[in-house]
From Swiss-Prot:
Limits of the C2 domain: 691-811
Region (Disordered): 1-40, 513-545, 845-880, 1200-1254
Keyword Magnesium: no
Name of the protein in its database record: Protein kibra
Main function: Regulator of the Hippo/SWH (Sav/Wts/Hpo) signaling pathway, a signaling pathway that plays a pivotal role in organ size control and tumor suppression by restricting proliferation and promoting apoptosis. The core of this pathway is composed of a kinase cascade wherein Hippo (Hpo), in complex with its regulatory protein Salvador (Sav), phosphorylates and activates Warts (Wts) in complex with its regulatory protein Mats, which in turn phosphorylates and inactivates the Yorkie (Yki) oncoprotein. Kibra acts synergistically along with Ex and Mer to regulate the Hippo signaling pathway.
Biased composition (Basic residues): 17-26
One GO term (biological process): negative regulation of organ growth
Keyword tags: Cell membrane, Coiled coil, Cytoplasm, Membrane, Phosphoprotein, Repeat, Transcription, Transcription regulation
Gene coding for it: Kibra
MF terms (GO), sorted A to Z: kinase binding; molecular adaptor activity
Residue ranges of coiled coil: 129-215, 258-288, 319-445
Bias (Low complexity): 1-14, 513-544, 845-856, 864-876
Length: 1264
């Protein structure tokens, strides 16, 4: 190779082989292109493009650039930033991840040599072992104290037994006032025997705990010694790969073993039920049908047999579904908030600290009980030496208790407070999961009539980790599903009881701060409203609940209000969420019943569509906006009226009755079509809300008398409509039936604007036919001296009123600020004539305009569907107002339509879950306002031409432009796919770059931006494919796993396998004993199986008769636990180690898992020792085979290190012996990729001797 080639080769960057994806080395030979190679050096490339260097003088090859010794740091102390010193290289493996190569020492390691995380882990392991040793000492001391109590109890039992056996005491002929009453003595004897049995059982539990803790500590000690025995305390890559494969094998054994355990537990449930039957039959056969687990009858689900809302019509069903969807989203958001709070609590209490506190408090209790036992001993029959020992023991116990209480008060108080807060959050989370599940089932009941689907995939707090399918995560290894959802350790209760005993002993008043904390939390829990646990399935009550409006076209331009302000604003406000399970942030006033306070409808009915549009037009003019309202939005299939979702809540009209909805089937919904095409993404406005003024109105119609009873009960927050300027201002309500009402009714005037209570009832004679054509208008009027002013209006459609039912509902009050030019619509006095005349005049003007205009406003339906209508009105669509309007009237929209704006971009991988977070658009039925609406729209400033859908495009010449403008100058808005049917000027043709005509109703984005899930713009408009990332970009900021992490993961898997095998063995023994007891009808064992709490908890986990909701809740809790862990990991700063996770790993080894109860020795059957030899059926054969397989896996895994070292030695030796004959890396570099392939291809390279007798080792880059 010439010198010119030698100077050019270094400038060539390595080109990775397309099939080489296993290892990536970060070498950049181009960085030294300005420096020539030393004399005698050459550059070459292997088969995958990796550059290596040839030393012709020493006849060696290496991966290291010889020029690095002049440009790179010589040691780690000289490194700056992410630099590595000379001889070190960072590489990447697709299975293992990043690892590091030390070419000088010819070693590889998993840890980053620049980081000190390994030393921090070793120090943490040492500290934890020290703390675990203290905890173990507490357990041993507790064992000693309990042993002393057992000795005292045994002594007392022996004493009573002797008295009972004495004929002089039991068979005495003395009177009943003798020294020992036989009946009392027998009772004392039974109590003493039971006390001895219970103490023995507790002693057995403590022994098991001690052995479990000792085994875990021994495992941690062995892990530390094993890592310290390694060179540099690191595993090489071959060992890491072997450990990973072994972990996967153990995981497979765990999966199969867990199936066996579940089968055994199910069989235990059946045996327990059979024992319960036998026990009941023996005691009272009549109770069998009442208490048998298999004869229960549950009628809880009968209300769902026909489906929720099966009897409802289309509009009512869709409204109910929309309301339920909103509540479901609110609960999901509440669950995420609770998950976030729980993730914050994890860092406050170190893993294992609560267990240590429990042991400390239990030790105090044991000492207290021992002290009481010693105080109850009679010293009369004792010797002097025994008396001295007892007195010394008492004195020592009193001193120990004093010191223990002082230490407990100072150290445990804060942890108990954090633990209690965590338990409250867990209880709220459990309640939230229950309520979410109920709402989810209710939403699924609408699936037969809806195109929307609900998935229970994961909660909002879920975060995608995108881990490899072949790798085990932290939650897979260290989270025990049987430990999730168990009754937590009530350390606070233990502490209170212990404190009470100490205070009684010392006769001191309570001073422990934990008691005060508990009382405070109880008070807060009483004052804070909790989510309801039951769902009302009544169609009338559920449909009368408000569905807040929202627009899919808006974006959130308003910053979030502080949470405290939002809660304060909603505290006294009755909302829709109270009728169904709702987050605690939304409550009704205590004086209002839940079923009524939650009811709130809009102030205007469906007949007031024109008035709504006029109000919004006035609002636009007030805001000085040039473009008026554009009614081109998506229309629901059950509505022929614009949904008006973009209006403020005070302007919306909505029917709340259930029976007289007159909805008409119209065109196919844009939402359903676009949703089916996969391009529709519904979004919702995320805007804060203010307090709304409301009026509670009751309506009832007396058919026999022909009288409408109107009850104006109370109002709420009228100060939001008007601020009193003087102290003598008063407010009253005035109501009238429009149109053509000559009389009006009014309430008494009150000075309270916040919560005035009127309680006025009026009877209005009117026939039912006329009533259904009327609208009830209620105005809020203020009086300041002699001056009256209308500040708000409520309008209720009587066409939707159900005369067979009475209603009492809250209605939002529309402020008069929104209708400054239409104040004449309100009644100025007790007479309604002026108002009726004004309305009639407005109708005449609109009708005249309608007759003068020849073009009706129409627009093509989505994907060319036919419009079916029984009305004379035409189909229109509601489009979002301009962006300027959105920014101006944003504060008028309710806050509870803000659906999870913060978690929309959390998980880009869960499309199914994201679909669940989309809201349903509630549709409103059309009555008689179509013609009026068309007439009004034709008089708007900007009109739209009547054009049919056609695929032929014909633009007229520019010379005909003036003539065309004279005919019709209204712009035509179409999608790119479809073109106008007639000749249209290009200036009038507003083309939207959307995929199909079903997209024409979607918002046309003004600013392009990258894709964000749940954002305003459509994905098809905003998604830009990102450039693929290079696989060689390995600069991650997270802390990688160390060898200590890897060894802990492996030992955790082995520990789980060991205890799983032990549990299976105990369950098999227990099953055999209980089965024989069932066959023999043993009453003792049957009583034990029914009364033993530990056994009851065990079988309750696998009870097939358990309510499906409970099983689903258990799964949700398990999933939520994993999501909390993932959420907490996201809080760890980049580049910082996760200290809490490492502590949880260590705590796993000393944490006690599921325990299998053991029968007392007195209950064991004589032939219970030969359980393993008996085989009843094929299922037990499978159980035995699986247990043998697990045992085999345990034995095989114990020789891992030995096999690893031998395999590594043989592989290295084989590579050395055979690779030395390989001639040149340039001709045959493949055999040196890894030691194993090198042995297989060495024979092929023996006959290719050319120039050099050395090769390149892919890991170390030196001659071998």
């Amino acid at each position: 190779m010439s010198n010119q080639q030698q100077q050019q080769l270094p400038r060539q960057l390595p080109q990775p082989h397309p099939h080489h994806h296993h290892h990536h080395h970060q070498q950049q030979p181009g960085q030294h292109s300005e420096f020539p190679l030393p004399d005698g050096w050459d550059i070459a490339r292997d088969f995958d493009g990796k550059t290596y260097y040839i030393d012709h003088i020493n006849k060696k090859t290496t991966w290291l650039d010889p020029r690095d010794r002049y440009t790179k740091p010589q040691s780690f102390e000289d490194c700056v930033g992410d630099e590595l010193p000379v001889g070190w290289e960072e590489a990447y493996d697709s299975n293992i991840g990043r690892y590091y190569i030390n070419h000088i020492a010819q070693t590889t390691q998993l840890e980053d040599p620049r980081q000190e995380w390994k030393s921090v882990q070793e120090q943490m392991l040492s500290d934890y072992l020290s703390a675990a040793q203290d905890q173990l000492e507490n357990k041993r001391e507790m064992y000693d104290v309990k042993q002393q109590r057992l000795n005292l109890a045994q002594e007392e039992y022996n004493h009573l037994n002797k008295l009972a056996a004495s004929r002089s005491s039991l068979c005495s002929s003395s009177s009943s006032m003798s020294r020992h009453d036989p009946e009392l003595l027998r009772a004392d004897l039974m109590l003493a025997r039971e006390r001895v049995r219970q103490l023995k059982q507790e002693l057995n539990h403590i022994t098991n705990d001690i052995s479990y803790t000792e085994r875990g500590m021994n495992t941690l000690y062995s892990v530390g010694e094993k890592i310290n025995a390694r060179q540099n305390g690191c595993y090489d890559i071959a060992e890491v790969q072997a450990i990973r494969e072994e972990m996967l094998k153990v995981h497979k054994s765990l999966v199969s073993g867990e199936k066996v355990r579940e089968e055994l537990m199910r069989s235990l449930v059946q045996i327990k039920n059979e024992l319960s039957r036998q026990q009941i039959n023996e005691e009272n056969a009549e109770l069998l049908s009442a208490t048998s687990p298999f004869d229960r009858v549950c009628v809880a689900s009968q209300t769902d047999l026909c489906g929720a809302g099966e009897h409802l019509n289309g509009g009512a069903r869709f409204a109910e579904m929309a309301k339920t969807k909103l509540q479901y989203a609110e609960w999901r958001k509440h669950i995420k908030k609770l998950q976030q709070q729980l993730a914050d609590h994890v860092e406050r209490i170190e893993p294992g600290q609560l267990e240590s506190d429990k042991d400390r408090i239990l030790l105090i209790q044991e000492k207290e009980k021992l002290l009481n036992d010693l105080n109850s001993i009679s010293l009369k029959s004792r010797s002097a030496e025994e008396k001295l020992v007892i007195q010394q023991t008492r004195h020592k116990l009193e001193e120990d208790l004093k010191e223990a209480y002082e230490a407990t008060n100072t150290c445990v108080a804060n942890r108990l407070r954090f633990h209690e807060e965590k338990q409250l959050l867990l209880a709220k989370l459990q309640e939230a999961l229950k309520s979410t599940n109920l709402l989810e089932e209710r939403l699924k009941s609408f699936s037969s009539e809806s195109t929307f689907s609900i998935s229970s995939g994961s909660s909002l707090g879920s975060l995608s980790t995108a881990s490899s399918k072949s790798a085990l995560s932290f939650t897979d290894i260290y989270i025990d599903p049987f430990a999730v959802g168990e009754s937590p350790i009530d350390v606070v209760d233990l502490q209170r009881r212990s404190q009470r005993l100490f205070q009684q002993h010392q006769r001191l008043p309570p001073v422990h701060p934990a008691v005060q904390l508990q009382q405070q939390h109880q008070l807060q829990q009483q004052t804070q409203p909790q989510p309801a646990s039951e769902v009302s399935l009544s169609p009338r009550s559920s449909l009368s609940i408000e569905t807040p409006p929202a627009s899919p076209m808006k974006y959130n331009a308003i910053a979030d209000q502080p949470q405290a302000q939002a809660q304060a604003a909603l505290k006294e406000e009755p909302t829709y969420a109270n009728a169904m399970p709702a987050p605690p942030a939304y409550t009704a006033p205590p004086s209002v019943p839940m079923a009524l306070a939650a009811v709130r409808t809009h102030p205007y009915d469906l007949d007031s569509t024109v008035l709504d549009c006029m109000m919004l037009e006035a609002k636009l003019q007030k805001l000085n906006l040039s473009s008026p309202l554009n009614l081109n939005g998506p229309l629901s299939p059950i509505s022929e009226k614009p949904s008006l979702l973009d209006l403020p809540q005070e302007m919306l009209s909505r029917s709340s009755s259930t029976s007289n909805t007159r909805s008409v089937s119209a065109a196919v919904s844009n939402e359903s079509v676009a949703g089916d095409s996969g391009v529709f993404e519904a979004s919702r406005a995320h805007l804060p809300r203010k307090e709304l003024a409301q009026v509670q109105i009751g309506l009832k119609y007396l058919k026999q008398e022909g009288v409408l009873v109107v009850s104006l009960e109370r109002a709420n927050n009228l100060s939001a409509l008007w601020t009193a300027t003087t102290d003598n201002s008063q407010v009253y309500l005035r109501a009238a039936l429009l149109p053509n009402s000559l009389t009006s009714i009014r309430t008494k005037a009150l000075g309270d604007f916040q919560k005035p209570v009127f309680n006025d009832t009026f009877a209005v004679p009117i026939s039912l036919d006329k009533l259904l054509t009327k609208s009830l208008q209620v105005t809020v009027v203020t009086m300041t001296g002699q001056k009256e002013e209308i500040i708000g209006t409520v309008q209720i459609s009587m066409a939707e009123f159900n005369p067979d039912d009475s209603t009492l509902k809250w209605y939002n009050v529309l402020s008069s600020k929104f209708i400054p030019t239409f104040e004449s619509l309100d009644l100025p006095s007790t007479s309604a004539a002026a108002a009726a005349a004004a309305v009639a005049a407005s109708n005449n003007i609109i009708n005249n305009n309608n007759n003068n205009n020849n073009n009706n406003i129409r627009e093509e339906s989505s994907d060319e569907s036919t419009i079916t209508s029984s009305q004379t009105s035409t189909l229109t669509r509601n489009q979002a107002p301009p962006l300027e309007l959105q920014a101006q009237i944003a504060e008028e929209l309710p806050e509870h339509v803000r659906l999870n704006e913060q978690q929309c971009s959390d998980d880009d991988d869960d499309d199914d879950e994201e679909e669940d977070e989309q809201q349903l658009v509630g549709t409103l039925g059309l009555t008689h306002s179509g013609c009026m609406l068309d007439a009004y729209l034709e008089n708007m400033k900007q009109e739209y031409a009547d054009k049919e859908t056609n695929t032929d495009c014909a633009f007229p010449p520019e010379k005909l432009r003036s003539q065309t403008q004279l005919l019709d100058d209204r712009p035509v808005k179409r999608s790119q796919t479809f073109t106008p049917s007639a000749a249209v000027s290009k200036n009038r043709y507003n083309c939207r770059l959307n995929r199909s005509d079903s997209d024409s109703a979607m918002h046309f984005g003004v600013t392009p931006h990258t894709f964000h899930r749940g954002a305003v713009e459509r994905r098809s408009l905003r998604f830009q494919p990102k450039a693929t990332k290079s696989v060689t970009k390995l600069h991650h900021t997270h802390i990688p796993r160390t060898s200590l992490d890897l060894e802990l993961d492996l030992q955790a898997q082995h520990s789980k396998l060991y205890f799983l095998n032990d549990q299976i063995s105990k369950l098999q023994n227990l099953k055999e004993v209980l089965q024989k007891a069932c066959d023999n009808k043993d009453p003792l064992i049957a009583a034990w199986a029914i009364e033993n709490e530990e056994f009851q908890r065990l079988v309750a986990r696998a009870d097939p008769t358990k309510c499906p909701e409970e099983r689903l809740l258990q799964k949700l809790l398990m999933k939520t636990t994993k999501e909390i862990h993932k959420l907490r990991k996201t809080k760890v700063p980049k580049g910082c180690p996760d200290l809490v996770s490492f502590k949880e790993k260590m705590f796993f080894f000393t944490r006690k898992g599921m325990s299998v109860p053991e029968l007392p020795n007195d209950f064991l059957l004589p032939d219970a020792q030969a359980i393993e030899e008996e085989e009843e059926d094929d299922d037990e054969d499978n159980v035995a085979e699986t247990a043998i397989a697990i045992n085999t896996a345990l034995v095989a895994s114990s020789n891992r290190n030995k096999n690893l070292s031998e395999h590594h030695h043989r592989s290295t030796g084989g590579a050395v012996s055979k690779l030395t004959a390989t001639p040149t890396p340039a001709i045959n570099p493949a055999p040196v990729a890894t030691p194993v392939p090198a042995t297989s291809n060495a024979n092929e390279a023996n006959g290719e001797q050319q120039r050099y007798d050395y090769v390149v080792d892919r890991n170390y880059g030196v001659e071998v």
